[in-house]
Regions:
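Terminal amphipathic alpha-helical/low-complexity segments used for targeting or macromolecular assembly
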Residues: 1-187, 318-320
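Structural signal for interior beta-strand "rungs" in well-ordered beta-sheet cores
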Residues: 193-314
Length: 320
């Protein structure tokens, strides 16, 4: 009985492979032809998301040796570890950056070696910026530790706080973004968005000592500017008020669409700040669930009135 079932299964599998698979292949090819923009069958290779995320993990291990990464780091082997990781990141990331640059140049008659040379320069500059990036991250971690009464130590912050991963990724991706590298910065930040729930566009400009408490649902748009010593809580949106369109109805890109936040600002959970002309002055406190679409002077505290609540008791008597 068992042998008969196995033979029947093998026959069904063979029939499917010989008859149905070719039909399915033809259907998919027809679908590719009718619905463009979802395949990349012609032209140069696109950067590999897998390689980019692996490189990002290696950069974490360089910035936080002994904390993030799968290697056991000691003072005895740290020099070897850094040399190995830097060399590996340089070679792999250069290939991916070159692909991303060629992706932009595919419709232009660029000399073949320009993208390759530019990729080497960009990755070299990123790696040389790591000491400065790390100095900035030190302030971000200190801001998290001092700004959260539940934080026990810097070690706990580095190992467990999602904002550390999100902000670190942003600061790496921002270096590539400002050097004109397409695709890869978004791969990095969207990868971390999927892991942490914190969405920071690599084009945003963020100052020192930045802290996102809890983090889930935070959105920071491409043209947002954030000063020093700023603290955001979960669910804060720094977004666009509207999207101006051209005469054909297409969204006009490249304009400032997101708010500017001054120094020493605290924005509590659920607050929404919209618009490129919205400027929040220094030392402002914005309460939870506040909706802001215009500029706020320095030193202002904004809150919304508490909603009226009604309680119905067991004796059906309503109490306000």
């Amino acid at each position: 009985m068992l042998e008969a079932l196995l033979r029947q299964h093998d026959k069904v599998e063979q029939d499917w492979a010989e008859k149905d698979v070719p039909k399915l292949v033809d259907q998919l090819l027809d679908n590719y032809a009718r619905f463009g923009g979802m395949d990349h069958l012609e032209g140069r290779d696109l950067p590999s998301k897998k390689v980019v995320t692996e490189v990002l993990e290696d950069l974490f291990s360089i910035l936080f040796p002994g904390y993030l990464g799968d290697s056991e780091i000691t003072k005895a082997n740290i020099k070897y570890h850094l040399g190995l990781k830097l060399t590996s990141v340089y070679s792999r990331l250069t290939i991916e950056v070159e692909k991303s640059l060629k992706y932009i140049c595919r419709k232009m008659e660029c000399p073949q070696d320009i993208c390759q040379k530019r990729a080497h320069v960009v990755v070299k500059e990123l790696l040389e910026a790591l000491p400065e990036i790390r100095s900035g991250l030190s302030g971000d971690i200190s801001a998290a530790y001092s700004g959260d009464p539940a934080a026990v130590s810097n070690e706990e912050v580095i190992l467990s706080y999602p904002c550390v991963l999100a902000i670190t990724t942003y600061r790496i991706a921002h270096e590539l973004y400002t050097r004109g590298v397409p695709v890869i910065p978004r791969i990095m930040t969207e990868h971390m968005h999927s892991l942490t729930g914190i969405d920071i566009h690599p084009g945003a400009k963020i100052g020192r000592n930045f802290f996102i408490d809890h983090g889930t649902g935070v959105v920071i748009g491409e043209t947002a500017e954030i000063g020093d010593n700023v603290k955001l809580y979960q669910g804060v949106t720094l977004g666009a008020l509207s999207f101006p369109k051209d005469e054909k109805g297409n969204i006009i890109k490249g304009r400032k669409r997101h708010p500017t936040i001054g120094n020493n600002v605290v924005i509590y959970s659920g607050a929404t700040l919209l618009g490129g002309e919205t400027i929040i002055g220094d030392n402002v406190i914005i309460g939870g669930n506040v909706w802001v679409t215009s500029s706020v002077p320095a030193g202002t505290r904004i809150t919304i009135a508490a909603p009226e609540q009604h309680y119905k008791m067991e004796n059906n008597i309503e109490k306000k």
